[in-house]
């Protein structure tokens, strides 16, 4: 099975769907919103081509479910808020928003929500139906999606940790895994494994910046939010807990060790410094803003029961990783993996050690020399 076929969230609206298990991401989006507003404010000051008539925006790696339109709502509200501040300087423009993700993404679950979303925009923002146009642009964000110099603003949240492929060099010539007992590049991984993952991330992120800089107008903006490394040595991110759960099944004899050793997630969690260095080395963008922050897995969860919280966290992580796990380990063992995941989560949550570190970075495309 091709990797792109399983790099998706759980679709539909069932109990294990991403639509029902993505409340954590809403907390991250709330943290991003003030930065988004400032990014839009700077964008509208830049006097880009045709921006007074139609602002062209894309959400790269939009996923599915209500969070997709929550991002769209935040973008529209930010544009309208800044436009109201400018009053006569800027008439309310049409907004054209492209939702991007891989072809297997459940776009239909988003499209079903559009009629009510448009009505809500009209009621709350005064935006008449037709003044905000939302469509899909399926495909990998590591490849060209739009014509040259056609976009004003690109947004992406919680996507850049996904690599275009599993790094090469994780298996020796004799077929032995160099990442035995692990499913990604963690702090405990061997240096060759860490290097292989960093090299793949550097290649992919450089490609991402180069391709999308070509799609943006000069002075166009890009706002990226991704998971990043923290300084806490004893913290446990969700992939660490997932790795521990799978290892439990190996120890208990429910899963062959070779099955674990042959599995590596196409995921890399960079440091803020690595992201910054790659942006500077690629050279197409100026860094306007960079911030790191952490959000506990159970933040915003009101029920004060560690086991219920742990099940909630397990369901959230399952909605993200089940398709790729099921393609390798089989669907039958998925409930067992996340039952053990919840047990590990219940141990770290009371200690405040279960969280994601996050990075927000705001970028502006540098002008061509001929534009200066």
From Swiss-Prot:
Organism encoding this protein: Coffea canephora (Robusta coffee)
Top EC class for this record: transferase
Cofactor: Mg(2+)
Signal sequence annotation: none
Protein family according to the UniProt entry: Belongs to the methyltransferase superfamily. Type-7 methyltransferase family.
Keyword Ion transport: no
Residues given in the record as S-adenosyl-L-homocysteine binding sites: 18, 62, 67, 101-102, 140-141, 157, 159
Alphabetical GO biological process terms: alkaloid metabolic process; methylation
Residues engaged in binding xanthosine: 21, 25, 158, 161-162, 316, 321, 356
Keyword entries, A-Z: Alkaloid metabolism, Magnesium, Metal-binding, Methyltransferase, S-adenosyl-L-methionine, Transferase
Biological role: Involved in the biosynthesis of caffeine. Specific for xanthosine. Cannot use xanthosine 5'-monophosphate (XMP) as substrate. Directly produces 7-methylxanthine, and therefore the methyl transfer and nucleoside cleavage may be coupled. Catalyzes the 7-N-methylation of xanthosine, but does not have 1-N- or 3-N-methylation activity.
Reaction(s) this enzyme catalyzes, per UniProt: xanthosine + S-adenosyl-L-methionine = 7-methylxanthosine + S-adenosyl-L-homocysteine
Name of the featured protein: 7-methylxanthosine synthase 1
Molecular function GO labels: metal ion binding; methyltransferase activity
Pfam families documented for this protein: Methyltransf_7
InterPro entries the record matches: MeTrfase_7, MeTrfase_capping, SAM-dependent_MTases_sf
Pathway given in the UniProt record: Alkaloid biosynthesis
E.C. number: 2.1.1.158
Note on how the cofactor is bound: Binds 1 Mg(2+) ion per subunit.
Residues reported to bind Mg(2+): 179, 261, 263-264
Annotated S-S bridges: none
